[in-house]
Design a protein with these regions (language model features):
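Soluble catalytic domains of membrane acyltransferases
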Residues: 3, 7, 11-12, 16-162
Length: 162
């Protein structure tokens, strides 16, 4: 039912397309870029629902106020206190390792403004928990989300992210 509703909204009502050729793992990190609008969350959740997959997401804790907080949590949101960066990667690694399934989408820019200097937390979470990273591109002009590349972190972030 959820897949049908998400598919109808994503494909029919909004007119978006997908290009997906990556496997569906029990655990993974999604690295989604570019993150340019608050609509990314809703388009991304519809995309994941339409292709029959689930994902959680981290979001600035300031967004988790009433009435949005319970809605974001229901959607898979994890509130993040960005002033306490040191433990966030370790927390996510521990959650991933102790979970049967773990799907987390991260926007590496860390902001909705253009930022060529990506934050590397998504990579360190994946490396620490032994998870693949699925690279996802969001193209608003073509109304298409692409997921066609998987990275298995080797520990050499510069080489892996080329």
């Amino acid at each position: 039912m959820k897949k049908a509703i998400c598919s109808f909204i994503y494909y029919k009502l909004l007119g978006w397309k997908t290009k997906v050729s990556v496997p569906d793992y029990d655990k993974y990190i999604i690295c989604a870029a570019p993150h340019t609008t608050n609509w990314d969350l809703f388009i991304g959740k519809l995309f994941m629902g339409a292709i029959g997959r689930e994902t959680g997401f981290m979001m600035k804790k300031d967004w988790f106020f009433w009435p949005l907080g319970p809605i974001f949590r229901w959607m898979g949101g994890i509130p993040v206190d960005r002033s306490r960066k040191s433990s966030l990667v370790d927390q996510m690694i521990n959650i991933a390792k102790s979970s049967k399934k773990f799907h987390l989408a991260i926007t590496p820019e860390g902001t909705r403004k253009a930022n060529p200097n990506w934050k590397k937390g998504f990579y360190y979470i994946a490396q620490g928990a032994g998870l693949p990273i699925i690279l996802v591109a969001i193209d608003y002009e073509k109304k298409c989300i692409t997921a066609e590349k998987v990275i298995h972190p080797s520990g050499d972030i510069e080489k892996d992210m080329r």
